[in-house]
């Protein structure tokens, strides 16, 4: 499909996010750009493939910024295209941000360690004082580790699956 000239009825500013760069486009009404005629200018005849706009696209783009692998194996060309290069030196990666889930996990591990040490301290004290009860010693409670995840999907569908586990809807029922 060839590109055809078009105009907008109202002036508009658009932003294109390409990697670390942000390009600003001012689209104005009329056939000229800043008073210059278009016919004598070099025109870019490339088409840009833009994914469908959704609310989650912004989050996916932020996530892709930190990933090195392509987001979707079925459409690998989408995120590999580089529009421009940055004039800055190599970017320094930030250390991973501590998420709420990681904080909760660390807190839970700390509580488990504290609970285990408290139980062993009480058992030692009881045995020293001769208060131990007949019967075997029960080890502290251990939380079961979560079941191994099924083959983890990467890219956009992996992102959606992390938000909402679709596998529960598409499970094969044993009542067939």
Swiss-Prot record:
One annotated GO biological process: oogenesis
Subcellular location field: Nucleus inner membrane; Chromosome, Telomere
Membrane topology: Single-pass membrane protein
Perinuclear space side: 171-176
Ranges of compositional bias, category Polar residues: 108-120
Membrane-spanning intervals of the chain: 152-170
Any one of the GO CC terms: nuclear inner membrane
InterPro entries named in the record: MAJIN
Quaternary structure note: Component of the MAJIN-TERB1-TERB2 complex, composed of MAJIN, TERB1 and TERB2.
Family the UniProt entry places it in: Belongs to the MAJIN family.
Protein name: Membrane-anchored junction protein
Organism: Homo sapiens
């Amino acid at each position: 499909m060839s590109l055809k000239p078009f105009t907008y009825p109202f002036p508009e500013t658009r932003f294109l996010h390409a990697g670390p760069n942000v390009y600003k486009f001012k689209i104005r009404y009329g056939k000229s750009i800043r008073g210059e005629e278009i016919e004598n200018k070099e025109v870019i005849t490339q088409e840009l493939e833009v994914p469908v706009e959704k609310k989650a696209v912004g989050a996916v783009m932020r996530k892709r910024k930190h990933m090195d692998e392509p987001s979707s194996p079925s459409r690998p060309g989408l995120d590999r295209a580089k529009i421009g290069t940055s004039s800055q030196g190599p970017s320094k990666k930030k250390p991973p941000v501590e998420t709420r889930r990681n904080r909760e996990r660390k807190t839970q591990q700390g509580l488990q360690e504290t609970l285990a040490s408290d139980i062993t301290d009480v058992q030692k004290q009881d045995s020293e004082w001769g208060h131990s009860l007949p019967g075997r010693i029960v080890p502290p409670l251990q939380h079961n580790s979560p079941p191994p995840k099924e083959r983890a999907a990467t890219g956009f569908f992996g992102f959606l699956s992390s938000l909402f586990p679709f596998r529960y809807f598409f499970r094969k029922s044993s009542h067939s």
